[in-house]
Amino acid sequence: MATTPLAERLRPQHLDDYIGQEHLVGNKGVFRKFFETGNVPSFILWGPPGVGKTTLAKIVASQLDRPFFTLSAVTSGVKDVRDVIESAKRQRFFDQRPPFLFIDEIHRFNKSQQDSLLGAVEQGVFTLIGATTENPSFEVISPLLSRCQVYILKALEDSDLQRLLERALTVDEELKKREIEVVETGALFRFSGGDARKLLNILDIVVGATDGKVVITDKYVTECLQQNIALYDKKAEMTS
């Protein structure tokens, strides 16, 4: 049985496998132009959870073959930012192209933490990629925001979720070992709420609920999730 979550196993490595956000990654999308020219400005990805912000950032770095540093705004401080800046400067001795610095939940950085990024962004020490679920106009300081493009990511539509479901069932080696029949997708998509990661987590739960053939119906999905919530509540009671 696989220990890596389905969402991580299915994380796309190339833009052609990326699902959703056609306004950004379609044939005329700005991210296609990035790959054609190799010129990428610092930018912030703003959108709800599970719509592909982290994945898109990783694809950009991978397809342009540039170093990729990451920080989580939840656990990192000014010292961590300075350490990355020094690492990025050393990297420039070997590669004139600036590395990428990806900061997840950049809205969690306070003013002094965001200030510590300014000089490096301005000097091109690295290309900043921020990800946020909050409006950057309110959460990112003006000097930093003025140096970044902002790209809005939208919740996935049902057609996107359908493509993701089909990809999971045809590509994932663990799921291919199981007999799975999809009869209804209404509950699966409704509970996902346009969140790709949530869809794949629910699919993981539904498939893992039985050792036999999996028949996905609205009723079965609802029952599996109710049982999962009940089990979680019971465990919480035992540990509280």
List PLM regions with ranges.
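Walker A/P-loop
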Residues: 2-4, 33-72, 86-89, 118-123
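Conserved AAA+ ATPase "sensor/coupling" helix adjacent to the nucleotide-binding pocket
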Residues: 147, 160-176, 205-208
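A short, basic N-terminal segment
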Residues: 1-37
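C-terminal helical "lid" of AAA+/P-loop NTPase domains
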Residues: 186-191, 197-211, 223
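Short glycine-rich substrate-engagement loop in P-loop NTPases that contacts/grips substrate
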Residues: 24-28, 68-100, 111
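Short regulatory helix/loop adjacent to the ATP-binding pocket of P-loop NTPases
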Residues: 118-119, 135-149, 166
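Conserved AAA+ ATPase "SRH/arginine-finger" region at the nucleotide-binding site
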Residues: 72-74, 149-162
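C-terminal engagement/docking regions of AAA+ P-loop ATPases
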Residues: 217-240
